[in-house]
Amino acid sequence: SSLGVNIIAEKAKVQKSLKKIDLCFLMAPLYHSAMKNVANVRATLKIKTIFNILGPLLNPANANNQLIGVYSEKWMLPIAKCLVKLSIKKAWIVHGLDGLDEITTTNKTVVIEVKNKRMRKFLIDPIKLGFKKSSLNKLKGKDSIYNAKEIMKLFEGKSKDSPFYDIVVLNTAAALVVSENQNSLKKAIK
């Protein structure tokens, strides 16, 4: 990758990362046999398939807390119902009203929270949380070199006035709430 991140690291390195910093990346085809069998087909189709929905539900880490983005609002309730049956401790299923499969800064985001086998639906309004309204054009990446530079600016704290910064902060805040390290988006954003 342009950042030098090994996204296909061997199991021992992934486990070490998870133990050391509570974070790791699991390339689905390497860790889940069902995903391994369909990876090539998915790559050739170049359209969204049921595997875009199944992936988070088949999480090999068996995470108790999950922030799951979906590309279509119609999938939110079915996923939430599955998570209830899987006895997930806490999850947010999110869909930006602009079509993004994450919490967006261009519009409101629909959220279904699953917590203790109960569901509730609410909206996140980025403007009410103090973010500037963005546009999909401003959030689009470009080539891998440009994208890597923008990510490095974020890591170095040099992008505080960028739409990338806002969307990363908003989604990170949501992850902190879902992981129960913060109890509100407003507190997590600060």
Question: Where do the model's predicted regions map?
Answer:
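Glycine-rich anion-binding loops and their surrounding alpha/beta cores
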Residues: 2-8, 13, 19-190
